[in-house]
Amino acid sequence: VGSEMCIRDSDMALTLIKSGIEPNPVADQEEHYFTYAIYPHAEKWQEAKTVEQAYDLNQPAIAVAGGKPGSLLSKASVDRSNVVLETIKCAESGHGIIIRMYESENALTKTNLVVEGNYNKAFVCNLLEEEEAELELKDGVVCVQLKPYEVVTVKLV
């Protein structure tokens, strides 16, 4: 009681929704739809790739018809499994793209962000996409340092 889940003997309890009273005091009483899975594993959650399993469940791959593929299978990729590329979008300013990533396993991590496209500069930004520091961009690769569970926003122009 008081946590999101509890296992006792052969019983399992799982909290599916928690809701505040603002702006809707009856949100927890309305109709909701959930997708959840039980994912048994022998090793620690990090080694069992639990974050990847959750993404596969909640955001399945969608095939679309497209033009000629580029040299990469994605617009961007990282070389560390504990770094999750969360967002790739056009910059709010209309110039460049934003790539948002986070560290998922509570580990200080250095990763190489590989991007497809012709970009001249890379910046680390805050969540409002305001440039804070320039990053080295060489041959489509940007080295990014992430603190445990940190969200990092990179802008490429």
Name what the model sees in each region:
Residues S3-E4, R8-V157:
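Terminal accessory/anchoring regions of large secretory-pathway or extracellular enzymes
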